C-alpha cells in the first residue's frame, strides 16, 4: 500500500528528526 509506504518513510524521518533534535539539545546543554 502506498499510504503505508509513505507512513513508514515519515516514521523514519521523524525518528531521525528526534535523534538530531536530542543531539542539538545535548550540545547546547554542555
From Swiss-Prot:
MF (Gene Ontology): rRNA N-glycosylase activity; toxin activity
Lineage top rank: taxon: Eukaryota
Gene Ontology process terms (BP): defense response; negative regulation of translation
UniProt PTM: Glycosylated.
Enzyme class: hydrolase
Substrates-to-products reaction catalysed: Endohydrolysis of the N-glycosidic bond at one specific adenosine on the 28S rRNA
Coiled coil region boundaries: none
Keyword terms: Glycoprotein, Hydrolase, Plant defense, Protein synthesis inhibitor, Toxin
EC identifiers of the protein: 3.2.2.22
The protein's role, per its UniProt record: Inactivates eukaryotic 60S ribosomal subunits.
Family under the similarity heading: Belongs to the ribosome-inactivating protein family. Type 1 RIP subfamily.
Protein name, as recorded: Ribosome-inactivating protein momorcochin-S
Lineage: Eukaryota, Viridiplantae, Streptophyta, Embryophyta, Tracheophyta
Amino acid at each position: 500500500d502506498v499510504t503505508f509506504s509513505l507512513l513508514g518513510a515519515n516514521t523514519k524521518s521523524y525518528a531521525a528528526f528526534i535523534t538530531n533534535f536530542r543531539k542539538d539539545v545535548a550540545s547546547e546543554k554542555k
